[in-house]
Amino acid sequence: MSKPIVMERGVKYRDADKMALIPVKNVATEREALLRKPEWMKIKLPADSSRIQGIKAAMRKNGLHSVCEEASCPNLAECFNHGTATFMILGAICTRRCPFCDVAHGRPVAPDANEPQKLAQTIADMGLRYVVVTSVDRDDLRDGGAQHFADCISAIREKNPSIKIETLVPDFRGRMDRALDILTVTPPDVFNHNLENVPRLYRQVRPGADYNWSLKLLERFKEAHPEIPTKSGLMVGLGETNDEIIEVMRDLRRHGVTMLTLGQYLQPSRHHLPVQRYVSPEEFEEMKAEAMAMGFTHAACGPFVRSSYHADLQAKGMEVK
């Protein structure tokens, strides 16, 4: 019998080490079992990478993280080349261990008290008019990291009062009341929390999360701030059906969510959950039509769509796919 992994504080556990810590075991995918990517999933890299390297250097200089890098987002080159990034606060080690996600798991260190100021200065230096701030899950903190979110929002607005801020928050498991008390005092311009997938697959895809809890978080923030758009997203291709996706969309509307993102799941490594199917661009268009018919004010649906992909355009209701 193999010895259990003893996690050291501040150490990132990825791939096989991370998956070994998940109760619901996932067998590594053999190369011959991988689904071949269709033509529509091919990414063209920009010819000039100087802007990309500049953003990475600014992140390193200030000890900041982007979810673009930490989660191996397929749109990193495009977004960085356009001077945009989704900032990930509260460190780069997550207390959860979702088998679809490439963010490292482990025992995180204490939050950096100077991060809000460093984040605000970096955003000001980049001249951003719209920024997305997300975080790892911090189940080790009494408020789940809510006060740190609020401090970051305040610091960013102090540097640039006209900036638009979207927060992509964790579920604040067991801490919803405390977190909402904090976040409703310093609300963002868009409140985003992703359901990720359909409830039937939650035990496999989001161990430690609860579908109805996530819906309630979105609903309660909307009740406190009816004027602020709420947003959620799903990855598709993990074994769900289109009918199940549409039912989740209905649940989101019933809980007051007004903005939707749907994108194709991509397997970060062979140790993560495998892709079960590639959803065609035509199917994404059909689901977008369903979403708009349900009353979503905006729905970004396409193979490369992620919740923060061209988030500024999404917030303006412009076409993103």
UniProtKB/Swiss-Prot annotation:
What reaction(s) does this enzyme catalyze? [[Fe-S] cluster scaffold protein carrying a second [4Fe-4S](2+) cluster] + N(6)-octanoyl-L-lysyl-[protein] + 2 oxidized [2Fe-2S]-[ferredoxin] + 2 S-adenosyl-L-methionine + 4 H(+) = [[Fe-S] cluster scaffold protein] + N(6)-[(R)-dihydrolipoyl]-L-lysyl-[protein] + 4 Fe(3+) + 2 hydrogen sulfide + 2 5'-deoxyadenosine + 2 L-methionine + 2 reduced [2Fe-2S]-[ferredoxin]
GO molecular function of the protein, one example?
A: metal ion binding
Q: What is its EC number?
A: 2.8.1.8
Domain Radical SAM core: where? 80-297
Which UniProt keyword terms apply here? 4Fe-4S, Cytoplasm, Iron, Iron-sulfur, Metal-binding, S-adenosyl-L-methionine, Transferase
Q: List the disulfide bonds.
A: none
- State the family it belongs to: Belongs to the radical SAM superfamily. Lipoyl synthase family.
By what name is this protein known?
A: Lipoyl synthase
> Which gene is transcribed and translated to give this protein?
lipA
